[in-house]
């Protein structure tokens, strides 16, 4: 499952995902402001990239549309550790994937079960499920 779907900018909340400048990001902060008597509300989003540590901001009318990535959360088993990469097998489809070793997830070793997600044709290991 890859791609995006449109969503209203004013409906986004902290913790949801959004695409800013072609980069899938997690919303860290939102600020709504109404400029005055004549004018629509504006929304300022601050977001952090999912796959790369980059901070993004977006400002627009609350009624405007913005792309939201379709995220597929899956489970896999670590088959091998290969330096800066991890080879995992999907537990539903049994396909093998080679993903970059995450720096923010502890306890990755051969044989452990992990949760990973796919968004916009990219993959990331998010947590260790069982050791």
From Swiss-Prot:
Residues where Hypusine occurs? 37
Q: Tell me the InterPro entries matching this sequence.
A: IF5A-like (IPR001884), IF5A-like_N (IPR048670), NA-bd_OB-fold (IPR012340), Rib_uL2_dom2 (IPR014722), Trans_elong_IF5A_hypusine_site (IPR019769), Transl_elong_IF5A_arc (IPR022847), Transl_elong_IF5A_C (IPR020189), Translation_prot_SH3-like_sf (IPR008991)
Subcellular localization: Cytoplasm
Q: Which UniProt keywords apply?
A: Cytoplasm, Hypusine, Initiation factor, Protein biosynthesis
Instruction: Output the GO biological process annotations, alphabetical, semicolon-separated.
Output: positive regulation of translational elongation; positive regulation of translational termination
A Pfam family this chain is assigned to: IF5A-like_N
Where does this protein chiefly localize? cytoplasm
Task: Output a single Gene Ontology CC term carried by this record.
Answer: cytoplasm
What GO annotations for molecular function exist for this entry? Answer: ribosome binding; RNA binding; translation elongation factor activity; translation initiation factor activity
Q: Give the record's family classification.
A: Belongs to the eIF-5A family.
Query: What PANTHER family does the annotation carry?
Result: TRANSLATION INITIATION FACTOR 5A FAMILY MEMBER (PTHR11673)
- Its job: Functions by promoting the formation of the first peptide bond.
The protein's name: Translation initiation factor 5A
Q: Which organism is it from?
A: Methanococcus maripaludis (strain DSM 14266 / JCM 13030 / NBRC 101832 / S2 / LL)
């Amino acid at each position: 499952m890859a791609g995006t779907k449109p969503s209203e900018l004013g409906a986004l909340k902290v913790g949801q995902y959004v695409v800013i400048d072609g980069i899938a990001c997690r919303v860290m902060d939102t600020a709504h402001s109404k400029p005055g008597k004549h004018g629509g509300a504006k929304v300022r989003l601050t977001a952090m990239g999912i796959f790369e540590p980059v901070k993004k901001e977006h400002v627009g009318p609350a009624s405007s549309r913005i792309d939201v990535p379709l995220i597929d959360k899956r489970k896999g088993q670590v088959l091998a550790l290969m330096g800066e990469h991890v080879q995992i097998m999907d537990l539903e489809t049994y396909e093998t994937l080679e993903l970059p070793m995450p720096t923010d997830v502890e306890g990755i070793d051969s044989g452990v079960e992990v949760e990973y997600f796919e968004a916009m044709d990219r993959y990331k290991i998010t947590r260790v499920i069982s050791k």
